[in-house]
Amino acid sequence: MGKLTILVLVAAILLSTQVMVQGDRDQPADRNAVPRDVNPGRARRKLMKVLRESECPWKPWCG
């Protein structure tokens, strides 16, 4: 019975150490991370807007 108790204690220590090393996946860096761009075409539309607002010598190609 003594060997089983020691084995259970060692297993519990190893599991708790693994949890401490890996963490609980709720890190401050994750919470404060910059959100990914939910509108990926925004840069292209901004460029097209600039091209449209600029004075273009060829009106048909400027949109």
UniProtKB/Swiss-Prot annotation:
The modification Cysteine amide is found at residue 62. One of its GO terms (molecular function) is ion channel inhibitor activity. The modification 4-carboxyglutamate is found at residue 55. It comes from the Eukaryota. Its main location: secreted. Keywords: Amidation, D-amino acid, Disulfide bond, Gamma-carboxyglutamic acid, Ion channel impairing toxin, Neurotoxin, Secreted, Signal, Toxin. The keyword Disulfide bond applies. Disulfide bonds join 56-62. It is found in: Secreted. The modification D-tryptophan is found at residue 58. Expressed by the venom duct. The keyword Chloroplast does not apply. Residues 1-23 form the signal peptide. GO terms for cellular component: extracellular region. Belongs to the O2 superfamily. Contryphan family. Its target is unknown, but this toxin may modulate voltage-activated calcium channels (Cav) or calcium-dependent potassium channels (KCa). This is Contryphan-Ar2.
